Amino acid sequence: IRFNAKRPQKLALWPHYETYHATKDYADIARFIGLKGNTDEELAEAYAKKVIELAHECGVKLSLKDNGVTREEFDKAVDDLARLAYEDQCTTTNPVEPLVSQLKELLERCYDGTGVEEK
């Protein structure tokens, strides 16, 4: 949610959007479920936090580390995982076209659970 809610430098090729609207879409969802915010950006962040909160309430482990992946295993695989994610046909349907370096950064955050800590 957070990655796609930031205005991209380059839109994804598919589904050929002429304007970027992921932030507004997330804000609309946030409004629908009763979250508060003064801007679409604040509402998108409130929605991201709510999804994380719900995952914690359901007992979902939100990091690869907490799900048993060792740092050694992760470090060995992260470059290939980022490349494979970039090459996956579904990546082009993402609202934001990520760079391989951005995918690697997202994977690093997934390993550590950065940004999804329980409050």
Regions found by a protein language model. Give the residues of each.
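C-terminal charged capping/lid subdomain of soluble metabolic enzymes
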Residues: 23-119
